[in-house]
Amino acid sequence: MLQARDKTSELLSSLLFLILGFGFLSGCQSTDNTPEDRQTAEMAPIEVIKSPNDPRAYHFETLPNGLKLLVISDAAADKSAAALTVFRGSFHDPKERPGLAHFLEHMLFIGTEKYPEPDGYFSFIETHGGSSNAYTAPDHTNYFFDIQPEFFGEGLDRFGQFFIAPLMDPAYVEREKNAVHSEYQMQYKADGWRGFTVQKQAMNPDHPFSQFSIGSLETLDGDVYSDLMTFFEEHYSADQMSAVVLHKEPLETLVPWVKALFSDCLLYTSPSPRD
């Protein structure tokens, strides 16, 4: 579901890859001996080293639910933005359900318990000068949006609810299956994608890279909704997520309410290294 991106969203998507580095370094530098000590060290805020010419202020920490959070304060920003990566992608598709991770990316945007309107999120973002999108990669799925700063509070809350209490209404399964299939048909005609498919054919068939990943009406046939919910509960756990937020407010104001929101993301698994 990836289209042209706003520059702010491009920046945030890039910053999410830096979060991987923060998590890796914090783990490597820890010298604590017990699991409790290591968990305490990982949750302690990490000082972000930045250029002396960078006027922004940064805050990075791991929340109690395992989610890694980077908050950026930029008083000069003309837009506010946020992005969240789940470290689960097409490599995690069940062999019998190629394209399930991509299908979940589509279904996640269809309303939440707090904001149940199926298209309410996109309508709110677009009405207030913003944009939103997502993509599914082999090892992660990324969601992002930007919006006019004065509407960022509600925009971020609407965005965050997708990872807290999404509805994933089964009434929209067929609609989103067809949307996924349309992407497949569009890609199928592209020479670049065909070359990519040939590359997959040459791979070890036991490696997930060799598998079909977009999804189609055929691969998403049958009781796909049950498989969808199982995939969500097994993989969309807070300890498999990293989020980055950029807004005009100072960190003293921004950090507490951003932490409060993302602390509600559920921890389905015990904190563990990302598979």
Segments predicted by a language model, with ranges:
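Bacterial N-terminal signal peptides that target proteins for export
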Residues: Q3-L15
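C-terminal motif of bacterial Sec signal peptides marking the signal peptidase cleavage site
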Residues: S26-G27
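Scaffold signal of the M16-like zinc-metallopeptidase fold and its non-catalytic homologs
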Residues: E36-E42, T112, G155, F162-F163, ...
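M16/MPP (pitrilysin/insulinase) zinc-metallopeptidase core fold and M16-derived inactive scaffolds
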Residues: M43, A81-D146, K189-W193, S210-I214
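Mature N-terminal segment immediately following signal peptide/propeptide cleavage
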Residues: P52-S80
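M16/insulysin-pitrilysin zinc metalloprotease superfamily fold
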Residues: I110-K114, D146-K177, V255
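Acidic/histidine-enriched alpha-helical segments
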Residues: L167-Q185, P250, S270
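Conserved small/polar residues in nucleotide/adenosyl-binding loops
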Residues: Y268-D275
